[in-house]
Amino acid sequence: VFALVFSAVAACSGPRDHAQILMPRLSVPWSESVRILGDSVPGKTFYSDFLMIRDKMTPARWHAVGIHKSMNTLYHAVADSLFGEWKLQPDIVSTDSVVRMWAPFAIWSPRGDSAYMYYHHGLGPDGGDMWNSMRVLAAAGPDLDRWTKYDVYAEQEAAPGVRNIVFTGPVPRDACIFFDESLDKYIMYYADDAPRAIQARTSDDAVHWSEPVPVMGIPDPQEAFVTPESPFVIRRDGLYYLFVSGFDYARVALYVSEDPFDFGDPIANKVGEINGHAPEIVKENGHYYIACAHIASEPGMAPGAADLWGTYLQELVWSPATEAESAKIFRKDRK
């Protein structure tokens, strides 16, 4: 999930005509997009939830880090441009015996000389405990080539044995973080299982986080997803766009809100859906791009199934909202 500050172009001051509000759309079907990692043959290679972040030593160079193999290591790939040749580097390996090293996300530190990588990690000898952790690594330098465990408790004499645990909870996973200039805070969005919801936390330093608040629950009846997954939030023109995956790997639900901590009702305020799974959204030269991995190209496949293996990338285009879409945006004055 990409570490970029998405700032508002214009403040959202009261209701706007739907034609003034932009909605994200896929530019092509995923089968016509560019596969940047993995093999198209089902089962040959496994790539799933991942992050993308741009290098500060070589500004055109991009890094991707994500789930593969047995899911207790993270792959690392680099490319000289978004649509260039992605080359695999040595894995970022967990030194623990615990399985389930999931869904990384990286964001540059406030000083800009390093980056923090958040990931879900199981607790217990086999990672099977219900209670799990959100952990953090730090880049050894601005080239992002080497990552080490970050000591969250460096200033405390008494600290947990595993010092890179940021917080624990019932399967906290799939973090997405950005700096919200309007709040002067970092916001982390992530999926959780108790409650089954998308949660949000805030931070001044991108390391120490507030208590969580739920920003989006699951539908009841469970039409769109059973367990929320892979939230991704961007802020554009004073609005917050929440992309959230779920049980069906073919669908990503879209919600739009004026409030970063409340996206309304999961059914009534669902603006729409796009095809895909575990989206990562990046911005380069004024254009937005969306990447997804392990995609079901058509809704209705078995849970967790996909027919497009690997990681795919395409431009995310924006067009005026329809009147029906605009009506589902969550407004602060409608609380």
Feature roles, as predicted:
Residues 12-335:
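Carbohydrate-active catalytic/glycan-binding domains of CAZyme proteins
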